[in-house]
C-alpha cells in the first residue's frame, strides 16, 4: 500500500515538473499584439525572454518571469532565489548600487517612486532621475496661440495652456527683431532657467525660447500644419563622469512638433583604470588625447556594443589642469544584452581634447539643469 502511494506521489511530482518545463519553454512561432502595450510613466518596453514580443519591463520588487522580464536599463534582474526550477521571481538590483535620499526618505537602488503629482522618479546608483508627468506644461504652445499662459485646472494636477484672443498678432512679423540682439544671454536669465520659464524671442511676439539658448536659431516651416518654428539646439553638455560611462545631454526643438526635448548620448572621457602620468614624455605636463590600444566594446546598463571600436580618450595633466573633449561626434551604436535584447543609443566619440584650468566638474552648478519633456534630471539639495 505504501509503495503504491509512493509511486503515485512520484508520478504527480514528475507531471508537475514536466508541466513547469513546458510552460517555461518558448513557443515555436511568435504571436504578438499588433500594437505595443502602453507602459506607465518611467517604464520602458523590452522584449520578453523568448525574444518575441515587446512587454512593459518589470520594476524593482515586482514579480517577474521569462515572459515578463525586469528593466535591465535600471540594472534589474529576475531573482529566482535558491530554486533552479522556479518560474517566477522578483526583480532585484544586479549590483549593490548606492541608495538615494530625497525629501528625508531613503530609496533603494532601482526603486521607482512619485515624490509629487508632476514627477515619476527612479533611484539609480545614488542619483534620482525623474520624468515629468505633465509634458504639456514644458512644451511650446501652438505658435498661432496669442499671449499663451498656463492656468490651473480644477481637480487636476497639471496646468494647461490657454490663449488670450484680445490681441492677435502675426508671430513671425519683424524677423529682424527675432534674430537680433534680443537673443543674447544676460544674468537675469539664470533665474528664469532655474524656474523653467520661457523668454520672449522678439518684442511683441508670442514666440518663446529657453534662456539657455544663446545662438542664432533657424526657422522651420511645417506645410502640413501651416506653422513656423524657430529651431534651436544647445551644445552637448559635459560628460556627467570624469571617468567611466556617463551621460551627455542637449536640448532641441528640431522635430515636427517643434517641441522642446532633451536628447542624451553615452560618453566616456577616459577609462577609470587609465594610467595617469605613466605615458607623459620628458618635459611634458599634459597628455591630451590617447587612443585605445586595442578594439573594445562599449557597455551600457549591463549590455555590450555589437561591434568593437578603438575610441580616443582624454589624458591628464600634472600641473592642476584638466583635459576635456574639444571636438566630438555622435554615432548611433547598437547594444546587445545577455537576454538577447538589442537597442540603439547615441554615443560620443572623441576627436580631440584640450587641457585648461576651467574644470567644471569641481562645481556642480556648472552642469546644465533643465526640466523638459522626457526629462531626466538629478535633484540637488
UniProtKB/Swiss-Prot annotation:
Compartments, record wording:
Secreted
Matching SUPFAM superfamilies: FnI-like domain, Growth factor receptor domain, TSP-1 type 1 repeat
The UniProt entry, under Pfam families, shows: Cys_knot, IGFBP, TSP1_CCN, VWC
> Key word Cell wall biogenesis/degradation present in the record?
no
Q: Where is the signal peptide?
A: 1-24
User: Boundaries of each TSP type-1 domain copy?
Assistant: 228-273
Which InterPro entries does this entry report, sorted A to Z? Answer: CCN, Cys_knot_C, Glyco_hormone_CN, Growth_fac_rcpt_cys_sf, IGFBP-like, IGFBP_CNN, Insulin_GF-bd_Cys-rich_CS, TSP1_CCN
Query: Subunit comment for this entry?
Result: Interaction with integrins is heparin- and cell-type-dependent and promotes cell adhesion.
* Record protein name field: CCN family member 1
Per the UniProt entry, what species is this protein from, by scientific name? Pan troglodytes (Chimpanzee)
